[in-house]
Amino acid sequence: MSIRTMAAAAAAGAIFMSAAGLAAAAPALSPGDSGLEEVVVTAQRREESAQNVGIAMSVLSGQSLVEKSISYVNDLQNAVPNLQVEPAFGSSQPQFRLRGVGFIDYTSNNTSPVGVSLDGVAFALPIQTQGQLFDIDRVEVLRGPQGTLYGRNTTGGEINFISNRPTAEPHAGFSLEYGTHNELDAEGFVSGKLAEGLLGRLSVATEQGGAWQRNRVTGQSLGDKDKIAVRGQLQWDPTDALDFRLGVHGAQDKSDEQGLYLLQPFTPGSGPPAIAADSSRYATGWALNPTFAKLIGINANSKPGLDNSNDGIDLTANIDFGGARLTSISAYNKLIRREYADWDATQFNDSDEYLNSDLNVFSQELRLASSRGAFEWVAGVFYSNEDLHENFYSDLTDRLGGIAVTTYEQVANSVGVFAQGNYQLTDTLKATLGVREDHENRELIGLNTAFLPGAPSLTGGALGGSITSNLPSGKAELDYKPLSSTLLYASISRGVKSGGFTAHNTVTAPAADPFEPEKLTAYEIGVKSDVTRTLRVDASAYFYRYRDQQILGKVFDTTSQSFIGRFVNADSRISGGEIDLEWHPLAGISISQYVGFAEGYYTSKLLDVPLDPTLPPVDYNGRPESFPKWTYGGDVSYTWNVGAFSVTAESNYSFHDTYSQFFLLGSNDFTIPKYWLANANLTLAPASGAPWTVTLWGRNILDKSYDLTRNFFLPSSEVAAAGEPTTVGIRLTYKY
């Protein structure tokens, strides 16, 4: 059976079972009922219905995030079409792809073409996005280039998280859940009026325990969480025309690192016997070299783990001038990353890694927006300064006879000027035009890799370089509303991403050469329609022309006699589409489904150099890109009354298609097989509306074995990061 047929059958089956199987028990919608709720978003920096915005987007409420077990940004790939978030070697370095547009790198210094922001503050680098999601009002995932309305420019899209705001009335609540592997999670908030015109909100969350992996040699567990995060907000409204919101957040993560398992047998550098490939995805291995442990400053008996912190402060001010509104967003964020990982997944010191990163980011945005009318406009400027210091330690003793230490600093300054206007040509036709100009200077300082004394030495000294980019982008769109409940839109947009550097552990001169900015021209058409008061269907189709796409290539370095990764630029084409459906056929029944399709091909000369210098290079011109063609998912829920209680049964599921990472990893087969995931929730609440609920939940209830990524650091060790097995638990929630 084809993937297309499977997706259609699953969607039809879910809808049929919910509608037909529950019809006898569920009452029909009364004339006063509204089957569909209006979803209000701020994707265009104004509050408006998502159905009136000509952007393909997915919007998930805070409650939906809980039901779908989305506790951090990576989990969104199980709820959004054409989105993948791959953890580099299972680490806290996420690699985002949206509609096939992404950037694959295990180091910290390069930006992502998929932007992520919290409360209007954009994260500069992907490593900043790995905090807990808690006390969230909603998340908006915008597909396609963004940048003519706010903040940073993106080629792939934008993920915007909006937290719950302070309230005038006193509110408080908590949730407490316990699950398999002794995992204990808790979250709470308190909100209310502090003084006349001054509101406050304090939120806190923690995750503890949950180890699900085992050391194949010692039997030690791995995977315990140890996270805590806090967010405070003050909202001050001194006048009707002036308001301020101050946000402060802090997070600490001392969790175990996810372990990797062996895809293929591993032969130590010191010789046989080999370690067999793991029969269980939940097996792993590690052991610290005492010399390496002393160098990085941790105990020699330590498990792979993190000691990361992510703190920040932001101030948003709004001044209403009557005909226009001025918004200022000032933010400072600091991230400290201390992460020990074993990327060979054995007790040998073949690829043991330690990442020591310090990142400071300051950003300032000024935006002036008109009031509502036939002509609506917004214009602004965005400034960002990033300063990253990173030390990357690699214990290669068993394979290469030493410990490599890579150090560098990267400083980036960027300024973006943007403007967009919408004009209502007729009652049913609206035109949009947006422009943007970005200027960025990115400088790499002191890139150097050295082996400890007495071990083989790499030649060369500290390297450096800089790249300055001036990048125009823009958007043109037409919206047509033949009916009040239907929007048709067509757009042409251009997104850009700045160039950068390959900051891997090499001191060969080409490593300091910058790669060029990438440019993407997107053509898109779409429809958003409330077909009936109980059925909503949104669909989009797109075609991308990608110039100078940034790709991690592979070359053979004659100095170190091993493969090294180096970013190169190539052209490609990507096309695809999405369909989102929401249906409330009967009172108490809610069904949502999505399907996404994406395929891409390289369209320029792109050479991969084999390890064996006697073999000719491989040209990937015309070959497919590395991302899944099909994504599918949805959820079905049914709520009914049983005596004095309300019961809700909910199930959500997702499908991820097969894809190969052949270009990044050469001729070896690192294909990630397709997989299905399913979760379920059963919630009991008082029918009277009392403020407590009890939920029994299950994640990966079909106990599917699947991989999040497959890779190698040195060719001797082919590894994968597995997804979590089945877990079950109970959650108690109380809010007033």
Which role does the model predict for each range below?
Residues 160, 167-169, 177, 189-287, ...:
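Periplasmic-side early beta-strands and strand-to-turn transitions of outer-membrane beta-barrels
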Residues 235-239, 368-369, 382-384, 411-545:
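Structural signature of Gram-negative outer-membrane beta-barrels, strongest in the C-terminal barrel
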Residues 191, 361-380, 421-424, 523, ...:
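Conserved C-terminal beta-signal and adjacent last beta-strands/turns
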Residues 16, 34-169, 525:
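Acidic, small-polar-rich N-terminal luminal/periplasmic segments of exported/outer-membrane proteins
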Residues 170, 197-200, 241-244, 323-326, ...:
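Repeated loop/turn-to-beta-strand initiation elements of outer-membrane beta-barrel proteins
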Residues 94, 111-113, 125, 134-143, ...:
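Outer-membrane beta-barrel translocator/receptor signature
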Residues 314-320, 325-341, 481, 487-497, ...:
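Membrane-embedded beta-barrel scaffold of Gram-negative outer-membrane proteins
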Residues 424-427, 431, 541-545, 566-662, ...:
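Gram-negative outer-membrane beta-barrel transporters
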